[in-house]
Amino acid sequence: MKNCWFITGTDTNIGKTVSSIILLELARRYGYNTSGYKPIAAGCRTNDFKQYNSDAVLLRKFSTVKLSYQEVNPYLFIDPVCPFFTNEKNHMNVCMNKLSSGLQRLKKKSNWILIEGIGGLHTPFSNEFVMSDWIKKENLKTILVIGIKLGCINHAILTQKAILSSGLEFFGWIANYLLPTDTYNLTHIDILKKNMKSPYLGCIAYTPNIYNQIHHIPITIKLPLQN
């Protein structure tokens, strides 16, 4: 499947979910049958005696295809820590084949899929594999979300090297403004444009309560497509 995208970030809490939701909304506006996929999530809440991850709930909400929670998020860990740690603690193992079978189910229902990673590109899930191993196995096109703040240039360049050295396709990058005002936002982006080896897809302005406005706000990010 051509339009199947993997979102990774330079760090945690830098805008992977916001970027994912905006891209799902943009693909909806273009008329695609969209599915969001969060194969592994750490940190959950409980409602009506059911456990869920808030990022996965948002991906499900903004998918145009009707999906069960389990289809969006097959692996859910209670503690908001690295899955490798919770694997060891709870004697659980993340199976790469389960991640792949979940993706295959979504491919049968959708023609545009957005996969949101957990942590960073090399987040370990066991002694045998890290996130980038599965991305490569599935031949997914990678989009990097860069949270614009002090230190982001170094983080972005290091993550870019990790993407390329892992043999992944680096399709593009998104700048996410983490602060309402920052004198150096444009300076950061100008420097990133000179150092990134993939296209700049656009920026996301700092927008409080963005999820409540998503259907109405203008979106300036370019929709990643492959014909």
UniProtKB/Swiss-Prot annotation:
Enzyme Commission number: 6.3.3.3
Residue ranges that the Swiss-Prot or TrEMBL entry lists as coiled coil: none
Gene Ontology molecular function terms on file: ATP binding; dethiobiotin synthase activity; magnesium ion binding
Residues binding Mg(2+), per UniProt: 17, 55, 116
Pathway field: Cofactor biosynthesis; biotin biosynthesis; biotin from 7,8-diaminononanoate: step 1/2
Active site positions, chain numbering: 38
Superkingdom of origin: Bacteria
Cofactor: Mg(2+)
Single Gene Ontology BP annotation: biotin biosynthetic process
UniProt binding sites for ATP: 13-18, 55, 116-119
Reactions that this protein is recorded to catalyse: (7R,8S)-7,8-diammoniononanoate + CO2 + ATP = (4R,5S)-dethiobiotin + ADP + phosphate + 3 H(+)
UniProt keyword annotations, A-Z: ATP-binding, Biotin biosynthesis, Cytoplasm, Ligase, Magnesium, Metal-binding, Nucleotide-binding
CDD domains: DTBS
InterPro entries: DTB_synth_BioD, P-loop_NTPase
Top-tier EC class: ligase
UniProt subcellular location: Cytoplasm
Gene Ontology CC terms: cytosol
Family stated for the protein in its record: Belongs to the dethiobiotin synthetase family.
Subunit: Homodimer.
Function: Catalyzes a mechanistically unusual reaction, the ATP-dependent insertion of CO2 between the N7 and N8 nitrogen atoms of 7,8-diaminopelargonic acid (DAPA, also called 7,8-diammoniononanoate) to form a ureido ring.
Name the UniProt record assigns to this protein: ATP-dependent dethiobiotin synthetase BioD
Annotated source species: Buchnera aphidicola subsp. Baizongia pistaciae (strain Bp)
Gene from which this protein is expressed: bioD
